[in-house]
Structures are given as C-alpha cells and as structure tokens.
Amino acid sequence: MALSIGAACGSNDAAPAAAASPAAPVTTSEVTGTVPRNAIVTLMPAEPVPMPAGPAVMDQYSKTFVPNVLYVRVGQPVEFRNSEDMPHNVTVIRRGSGTEVFNVSTEPQQKYVHTFDRVSQFDVTCDIHPGMQATLIAVQSPLATVAGDDGRFTLSNVKVGSYKLSLTFEGRTVEQPLEVSQARTEVRVSP
C-alpha cells in the first residue's frame, strides 16, 4: 500500500483584479484525501504539541454518553463521570479486535479515570442500559479525524509546515512525511 501526496490550489471563479497585488502567503491549509475506510488519520507536527492541561471527560447523563464521540490524546487521562442519580457502568472495547479494555461500575455522582496507551478506536457502552453507546478515539495529535465509510477525510485549518502523516487501520499503522504548503493538500492511498 502506497501513499500518494499532491498539492492542489482551490478554484477562484472571481474576475481578475484590475491591478495585480501580491498574494498573501498561505498560512493554513485544508488536508483532504482518500484512505482506507474508517482509518484514523493523524498529522504529527514536527514540533511537539503540549498535552491538554486536564483530563478529557465523557459523562453519563440522561442515559446517554456525552459526548457520544470523544477524541483524546494517547497518554491523556479520561474521566468517565456518572452525573445521574442511578448506577451505570462503562465497558470499553477496542474496535476491530473486540478486546475488552475495562468494564467498571460507575455509581451515582462518581467517576472512573483511565489513560489510553495506544492509537485506536473504542466502543463505549453501559451494560445496565444497552441503548447507551459512544465512540472514543485515542490519537497522538490534536490534528486527527476518522475517514468516512467512503474513505474520504478532511482536516481544516492545518498550519503550513512539515508533518508526519499517520494512518491507523485494520490493526496496523502506515506513516509518511507530509509537507503542507498549499491552500489544499490532497492525500491518496493506493494499493
């Protein structure tokens, strides 16, 4: 499987200006592409990105996980709260492998803290209330998303610069350098 990376400029349908003025330098880009479906797409900046100051939070409220999709950094504590007056539990299973990471009871107004140690997607459920479901995605960088079922993804407002592009899918990770220097950078994975 190979990565194909190209730069594309956005279209400009406006009429040309009477006098040409210097173009403003590109400072941010949109990184788009087609990769394996449901792959975790991560851009790692050349400079380290500080870990968020506090834990990420997934709450149990009104028989719902809030938020129902949560991105966290690998190594960042995640606080699973129960803000209700009824007991719940939190079961976390690694998507793809079916490996149970943990299954803990969360009593009313209590919390459980866990730190994820690898890039992966996780299914979060409550065994007591089967309708409660969420997704947790652990990533190395705040510049991350999950490709859709069609393999398409978009990362907006990416600063121009050097990155390591990381794709995690089907239990493996593929990495390659990526230079973001255009208004739009296109990424494709070809077999």
Spans of features found by a protein language model:
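Bacterial N-terminal signal peptides
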Residues: 1-6
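Extracytoplasmic copper-binding redox domains, predominantly the cupredoxin/blue-copper superfamily
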Residues: 9-191
